[in-house]
């Protein structure tokens, strides 16, 4: 629900505070120059995903092929050439399964079929086939924590049918002193309110850590574990190259005590709102050790499948808005492989806040980078997630002047890049009115506070052109309003421009293919408050520098000593705010940078 299900709306603000505390604890304190180095084992055989470009599509908002105002699979297929031109390696699709859409696909009624408004299984098979022809891989969202209450499994569990009695987490609850029925514990759901809901037919409460219509599956029941592994195998058989696992931390809860009672979670002290998820510390419902083991089991299933069926390695990407020490466990341990890519959300939870980092100094950027690279287990690959369908868009969170810089960072740093659709053209948030809101995280609140929780602003339809509805749909209306800035911020206009966010993104794509960026090491530093400097280097290959003024005041910097470089470099990529031209000479001991200017230069 995720990428994050999450978060702040549901991802409790509390979890982000914890992550930020850990981020600061793990990082160096700011100084004139905050340094870090990341080394890659270029001598080892590298797999396809280790320097891949992943591209997240929110299907409802990407491309509408049939004019109903909602994006669909055929629409995605029709735009595959655009993704190929972006040099995308793998396309990750947010949920497309059969769903009543209480949480836009994260409430799954049938894990083995396609939501009709998105298309059919034939449409999906065609998408995979056409993508593979272009050299693109398809990754699916895997939503293991819960199903829809309209799923047949839940209906059978309600009826206590044999084999399904404990598919979900059920409890009788209690009677208080006045005789009124009360839930089994004080646990809260991500979308506000109790995590327990009374079911009249079964005469018990069921656990739902997300919406009422999203009952939690019971992973302490072996049949559930086996069933969800069948789900993975089914889609592997249909040609998917891997899975992004949604809302991982919630899969297991503590067992009840010997009397059958679940423990109440302690108060967090972060808010006085008793319905807000961050009102409690979720020590009994999230981040349990059993969840890590479950991820290891899923990785083993993927590896076993690859050994039997051949082909490229299938990949596992996990979403966990958890403390860093817990997230790092998903990589694996000395004896067991875990996810290839536990998502790195440090550019989202780090900095000043998850909502506004427009004045983050260079030392803040270095801390964010270091927090992952310094704590990642050796022998593993980093990944960089700047945004997703649950977060404010990068340009709205870091500032429009930093759009190109954030794309530069994502492409320039060592490891895997993961782009949320629209970031390559600089799409920004659209404020959605209470009346137009569709996100349950917002709709479960009220008109006075919904903006604290809504994820709709980053989910507006993709902007293809300056024609009606941004070229997304022929319908007179779309499921969410389209950002009026589509007139200038769109693929067609930016492709035709001599310089745009998209042309810069494509330059970064080309640079990323160089051996230095594929295999080279990295060093990074902050010079004062303004300048972020990153070096990528590899023996016998060109050296590249990313030099960025992250603030709104001009500055001149000497990067020669801190990056251990000398002489002149040639300018090869500049952001929209730079007045430099390609080929301009840059002397590393005297680099003037305008407000928010970012450049990439190469050794002569």
Positions of PLM-derived features:
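Loop/helix patches that line or flank the sugar-binding groove of alpha-linked glycan CAZymes
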Residues: 45, 49, 256, 260-284, ...
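C-terminal beta-strand-rich structural cap/linker in extracellular carbohydrate-active enzymes
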Residues: 583-604
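Beta-strand-rich binding/interaction modules
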Residues: 554-578
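Classical eukaryotic N-terminal signal peptides for Sec-dependent ER targeting/secretion
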Residues: 1-22
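Hydrophobic residues within beta-strands of alpha/beta enzymes
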Residues: 91, 243-245
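Acidic/aromatic-lined carbohydrate-recognition and catalytic surfaces
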Residues: 25, 30-233, 237, 250-324, ...
């Amino acid at each position: 629900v995720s990428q994050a299900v999450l978060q702040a709306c549901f991802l409790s603000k509390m979890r982000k505070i914890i992550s930020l505390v850990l981020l600061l604890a793990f990082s160096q304190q700011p100084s004139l120059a905050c340094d870090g180095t990341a080394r890659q084992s270029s001598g080892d055989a590298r797999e396809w995903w280790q320097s891949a470009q992943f591209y997240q599509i929110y299907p409802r908002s990407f491309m509408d092929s049939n004019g109903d105002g909602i994006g669909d699979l055929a629409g995605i297929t029709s735009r595959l050439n655009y993704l190929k031109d972006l040099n995308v390696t793998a396309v990750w699709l947010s949920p497309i399964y059969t769903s009543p859409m209480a949480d836009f696909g994260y409430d799954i009624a049938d894990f083995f079929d396609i939501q009709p408004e998105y298309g059919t299984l034939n449409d999906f098979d065609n998408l995979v086939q056409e993508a593979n022809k272009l050299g693109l891989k398809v990754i699916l969202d895997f939503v293991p924590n819960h199903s829809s209450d309209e799923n047949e499994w839940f209906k059978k569990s309600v009826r206590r049918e044999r084999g399904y009695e404990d598919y979900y987490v059920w409890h009788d609850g209690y009677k208080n002193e006045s005789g009124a029925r009360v839930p089994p514990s004080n646990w809260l759901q991500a979308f506000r309110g109790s995590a327990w809901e009374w079911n009249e037919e079964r005469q018990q409460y069921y656990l739902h850590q997300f919406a009422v219509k999203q009952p939690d599956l019971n992973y302490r029941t072996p049949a559930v574990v086996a069933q969800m592994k069948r789900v993975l195998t089914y889609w592997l058989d249909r040609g998917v190259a891997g899975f992004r696992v949604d809302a991982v931390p919630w899969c297991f809860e503590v067992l009840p005590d010997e009397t059958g009672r679940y423990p109440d979670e302690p108060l967090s002290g972060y808010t006085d709102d008793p319905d807000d998820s961050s009102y409690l510390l979720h020590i009994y419902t999230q981040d349990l050790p059993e969840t890590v083991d479950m991820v290891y089991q899923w990785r083993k299933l993927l590896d076993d499948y690859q050994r039997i069926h051949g082909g490229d390695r299938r990949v596992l990407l996990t979403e966990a808005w958890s403390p860093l020490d817990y997230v790092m466990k998903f990589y694996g341990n000395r004896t067991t492989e875990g996810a290839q890519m536990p998502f790195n959300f440090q550019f989202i939870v780090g900095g000043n806040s998850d909502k506004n980092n427009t004045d983050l100094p260079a030392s803040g950027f270095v801390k964010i980078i270091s927090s992952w690279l310094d704590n990642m287990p050796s022998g593993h690959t980093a990944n960089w997630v700047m945004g997703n369908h649950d977060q404010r868009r990068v340009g709205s969170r870091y500032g429009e002047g930093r759009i190109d810089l954030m794309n530069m960072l994502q492409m320039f740093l060592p490891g895997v890049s993961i782009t949320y659709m629209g970031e390559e053209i600089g799409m920004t948030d659209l404020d959605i009115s209470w009346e137009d809101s569709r996100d349950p995280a917002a709709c479960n609140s009220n008109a006075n506070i919904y903006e604290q929780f809504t994820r709709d602003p980053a989910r507006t339809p993709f902007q293809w052109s300056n024609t009606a509805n941004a070229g997304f749909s022929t319908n007179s209306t779309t499921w969410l309003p389209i950002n009026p800035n589509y007139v200038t911020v769109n693929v067609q206009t930016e492709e035709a421009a001599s310089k745009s966010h998209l042309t810069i993104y494509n330059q970064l794509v080309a640079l990323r293919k160089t051996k230095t960026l594929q295999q080279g090491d990295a060093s990074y530093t902050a010079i004062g408050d303004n300048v972020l400097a990153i070096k990528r280097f590899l023996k016998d290959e060109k050296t590249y520098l990313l030099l960025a003024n992250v603030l709104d005041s001009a500055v001149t910097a000497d990067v020669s000593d801190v990056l251990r470089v000398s002489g002149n470099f040639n300018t090869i990529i500049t952001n929209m705010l730079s007045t430099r031209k390609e080929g301009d000479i840059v002397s590393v001991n005297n680099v003037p940078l305008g407000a928010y200017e970012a450049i990439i230069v190469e050794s002569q």
